A protein has these predicted regions:
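Acidic/polar-rich alpha-helix caps and helix-coil junctions
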Residues: 1-19, 23-200
Length: 200
């Protein structure tokens, strides 16, 4: 769904990150989000005091990225003359907020992660990491949790450093009533939540 090297996002068919993924990211105090809370009807509240990785992953108020040069009037914004469109879109290209048909974002959450903010036509690329150190930590933590061996020592080496880097407090795992997969032990839930937040 991304054209990362082109400095644009959400440019292919129905796109958008799920609300479930957005709700997966914890508050900075380490507590899970209550998706039924009325305050989250305000788009800006969704991002307030949340895991820093959410802000890196999802476009929010104030996000910008450089666009490739506009050769034609954009199909999803047919207002104004071609010259007016070129002038309007020469520096910043917004996601397809008002697209229709196959070009609409079906969730309202646009991908930000991986966008090249310094894009120059034909003169850049965005690297894709093949395997991250964080993934190794998460594999270790999940194996320990699955085997019933997850404890403070494992947390100290795995989840705590990841949360600290994201600016989120570490809280001892407890069952989350809003976790999508109920019936899992709290430690497994916590590691899988962290994996989803870290690697999304």
């Amino acid at each position: 769904l991304l054209q990362l090297s082109g400095g644009v996002t959400d440019n292919v068919k129905p796109s958008g990150l799920s609300k479930s993924l957005v709700d997966n990211f914890l508050n900075v105090d380490g507590t899970p989000v209550d998706p039924t809370d009325e305050k989250y009807k305000d788009f800006n509240e969704v991002f307030k005091d949340r895991d820093g990785r959410l802000l890196a992953m999802v476009m929010h108020t104030g996000c910008k990225f450089k666009s490739n040069s506009l050769m034609n009037v954009r199909a999803y914004d047919e207002t104004g003359t071609e010259e007016e469109q070129k002038e309007k879109n020469k520096d910043i290209s917004s996601p397809r907020l008002n697209g229709d048909g196959i070009y609409k974002n079906v969730t309202g959450f646009h991908t930000r992660l991986g966008i090249d903010t310094t894009y120059v036509t034909g003169n850049c690329e965005t690297a894709h990491v093949m395997f991250r150190y964080a993934e190794g930590l998460l594999c270790y933590a999940e194996a320990a949790a699955e085997l019933g061996l997850y404890n403070d020592g494992v947390a100290e080496k795995t989840l705590k450093p990841l949360r600290q880097r994201a600016g989120v407090a570490y809280v001892t795992p407890a069952a989350d009533p809003h976790f999508p997969f109920q019936g899992l032990p709290p430690a497994v839930q916590e590691v899988r939540r962290e994996r989803r937040s870290e690697l999304s």
